[in-house]
């Protein structure tokens, strides 16, 4: 499976940076699943779940405080007040 570079940052610093298979967060219009090769876009993220699938198939589940996500051709940047992973 192709991967995409995911960077999650808050005002306090970097929360996560690395290659992932995918990311699921909740946007203003519903859940967003971002995979490698996704069409570029920018949208707000509302508080709720944050699910990251790592290249080894493991999953990081967390809760996000919301923020802004930018999906580019090569990477995904998520700016948030915070994410708490289980």
Locate each region found by the language model.
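Compact, glycine-rich, soluble single-domain proteins
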Residues: 5-86
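Intrinsically disordered, compositionally biased charged tails
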Residues: 1-3
């Amino acid at each position: 499976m192709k991967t995409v570079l995911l960077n999650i940052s808050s005002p306090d610093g970097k929360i996560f940076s690395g290659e992932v298979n995918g990311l699921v967060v909740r946007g203003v219009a519903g859940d967003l699943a971002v995979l490698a090769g996704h069409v570029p876009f920018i949208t707000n993220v509302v508080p709720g779940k944050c699910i990251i699938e790592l290249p080894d198939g493991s999953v990081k589940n967390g809760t996000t405080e919301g923020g802004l996500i930018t999906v580019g051709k090569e990477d995904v940047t998520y700016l948030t007040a915070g994410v708490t992973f289980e």
